[in-house]
Amino acid sequence: MPQQTITTNNRKSINRGKDIAKDTILTPNFYTTDFEAMEKMDLSINEEELEAICEEFRKDYNRHHFVRNKEFEGAADKLDPETRELFVDFLEGSCTSEFSGFLLYKELSKRIKDKNPLLAECFAHMARDEARHAGFLNKSMNDFGLQLDLGFLTANKDYTYFAPRAIFYATYISEKIGYWRYIAIFRHLEKNPGGKIFPLFNFFENWCQDENRHGDFFDALMKAQPRTVKSLSHKFEIFGYTFKHPIFDYYHRFRYFLNNHPIVSKLWSRFFLLAVFATMYIRDLGTKKDFYGALGLNAREYDQFVINKTNETSARVFPVVLNVYDESFYKRLDKIVENGTLLSAIDKRNNSNLIKVISKLPIFISNGYQLIRLYLLKPLESNDFQPSIR
């Protein structure tokens, strides 16, 4: 799809074609889930903790935090063209990611409010936070004469379906990794103010607390497992067709039995931790490396710190976590990053698409091999890894 850029009053509304044309596994995605299953969730096992977290959400600690000050005036004009481009790219990706969270949480709060009001209220509060973050980022984009077309994104972005259980795993890790990313940048710039290229970073300390509270919510929600659905269904859906028969009840019972088996939980924990960690590492050391350099950060050291801390935090809720301390862990991720450079070089050649695909095939196989070896790396049992916090 060609790039469509609309210019109004010297401001450009971006992403009317860019996001759809350039979607990759590394770009922020939009998600949907099984709303019927979500509204049937039984929270009684951990309702007290969920109610306490909801009360924290109601207090809205950052209600008056995201207020722009005079530091933003003229700050965009002080950046050199290269740093400006890197920072705008960061703003665009971050805003899209926050807006993606808003859409998911908002839709969940609307769909389940009648049958699961506590869960709906928690999602509504988180949607409020994500919308606030996205709006604040979009205002910073305005400083550069740009504005993300959020309405167009809502209508035209492809939505990826995840089952509720997968949403819990992936979103918990994403929220916790967001906390460690923001607090690490804030603390670095606090010690090295020369790297503070824009006043937006002054807000990261309080900002990361929103991410942390969101992660705590999903922690509590997962502790309300394993019996999340109050009643099973006689329906079976495939390829858009719905079949109804009591026999499908046994299928669902077997499926939920498998999903709730401890071994399955361990496999899912490893899968989602690796998926999130690998995606961030490949992106940051590939296309985002220069941005972190502009902040005075070493992208590799920064990512490894964030991954290690998120892995430790995840031991509070997941039965196992990744052995990121094994010497092969980051070596294999680095190999995938190197392969990414080779793939980019192949794309720049003046060869036919067929030749490019053939040239890339061994690299894709190498990436797959590295990821499989990482997944099969013996995990750390959370009870042994961090007994003090469990």
Swiss-Prot record:
Pathway: Porphyrin-containing compound metabolism; chlorophyll biosynthesis (light-independent)
Catalytic activity: Mg-protoporphyrin IX 13-monomethyl ester + 3 NADPH + 3 O2 + 2 H(+) = 3,8-divinyl protochlorophyllide a + 3 NADP(+) + 5 H2O
GO molecular function: iron ion binding; magnesium-protoporphyrin IX monomethyl ester (oxidative) cyclase activity
Sorted UniProt keywords: Chlorophyll biosynthesis, Iron, Metal-binding, NADP, Oxidoreductase, Photosynthesis
Known cofactor(s): Fe cation
Nuclease found in the keyword field: no
Entry function: Catalyzes the formation of the isocyclic ring in chlorophyll biosynthesis. Mediates the cyclase reaction, which results in the formation of divinylprotochlorophyllide (Pchlide) characteristic of all chlorophylls from magnesium-protoporphyrin IX 13-monomethyl ester (MgPMME).
Sequence similarity: Belongs to the AcsF family.
Protein name: Magnesium-protoporphyrin IX monomethyl ester [oxidative] cyclase
Organism from which the protein derives: Prochlorococcus marinus (strain MIT 9515)
Underlying gene: acsF
